[in-house]
Amino acid sequence: MAQQTPLYEQHTLCGARMVDFHGWMMPLHYGSQLDEHHAVRTDAGMFDVSHMTIVDLHGSRTREFLRYLLANDVAKLTKTGKALYSGMLNASGGVIDDLIVYYFTEDFFRLVVNSATREKDLSWITQHAEPYAIDITVRDDLSLIAVQGPNAQEKAATLFTEQQRHAVEGMKPFFGVQAGDLFIATTGYTGEAGYEIAMPNEKAADFWRALVEAGVKPCGLGARDTLRLEAGMNLYGQEMDEGISPLAANMGWTIAWEPADRDFIGREALEMQREKGHEQLVGLVMTEKGVLRNELPVRFTDAQGNQQEGIITSGTFSPTLGYSIALARVPAGIGETAIVQIRNREMPVKVTKPVFVRNGKAVA
């Protein structure tokens, strides 16, 4: 039996089509995925992301533990509330999960991890935390609502107390603050400004209804996927998994190689991959009729004249751009164009950086 978030009833009242998403009943859309997508790009939309797992870590050696657990380096986190995106890797350099870590005090950090990887994440974290005497608290008492879009922060702020508005005033991206009973973070998964707001489960339904009344459009998983793909953001299980290196998933920027004497899980394997060479994640754009879909082959000829083949990891029609886009994992050496096999047709595609839209504007 699939689990329900505290907002399940609100979704049904809003007319959602519910689907099983990694063991959670979640809204796919509320009538029009397209309208939901455009609402986030032009105004404000919201997503129930309560299926994600919030994990609080307490202990005097928490920073030391996270410097070993994660490929990115929490030594960078010195300001209260600052957040960091990182891969959590296995010994062979594969991605167990990608997550966000927040710093509050020297003995209090917070992780937000994916729903699909919850059990293995918690097992991995618990196993490696033991020598550091870390107290691990899974915050199943909290719901999480993402409010995203150019007008999202302004509309969400109409629900805040004066103290909460003051707490978030001027807050830069990738920060979080506990203000009253809300944890408000300037993070998201859409390429737009906004907040991800955690609150006690019993407050979630009223908060959701108030956001609807403030003119924030409920959005489902369908729009969430097209928005994140336009923004060039990875989806676990597609762009990366335990068999795929962050170097092959456009996550090289999340690996903190310095200081060279910092040991972290997967470091040795990544250093070998960096030396030998590795696949890369690129963007693909197809302006001709048709849709680039997951798992379609991508073919090109490298500079040495060798035929090479990669694979589309995520593909869709871009509602913002009006043509098809994709992320693809390919061998190194791809040029500016490639061929994608769609049924019996060979379709030319332009190769771009793996990001297509930022703040509502085309970048590809």
Curated annotation (Swiss-Prot):
It catalyses: N(6)-[(R)-S(8)-aminomethyldihydrolipoyl]-L-lysyl-[protein] + (6S)-5,6,7,8-tetrahydrofolate = N(6)-[(R)-dihydrolipoyl]-L-lysyl-[protein] + (6R)-5,10-methylene-5,6,7,8-tetrahydrofolate + NH4(+). Its EC number is 2.1.2.10. It is an enzyme of class 2 (transferase). One of its GO terms (biological process) is glycine decarboxylation via glycine cleavage system. InterPro entries: GCS_T, GCS_T_bac, GCST_C, GCV_T_N, GcvT/YgfZ/DmdA, GcvT/YgfZ_C, TrmE/GcvT_dom1. Keywords: Aminotransferase, Transferase. One of its GO terms (molecular function) is transaminase activity. One of its GO terms (cellular component) is cytosol. Gene3D superfamilies: Aminomethyltransferase beta-barrel domains, Aminomethyltransferase fragment, Probable tRNA modification gtpase trme, domain 1. The keyword Transferase applies. The glycine cleavage system is composed of four proteins: P, T, L and H. Belongs to the GcvT family. The glycine cleavage system catalyzes the degradation of glycine. This is Aminomethyltransferase. The gene is gcvT.
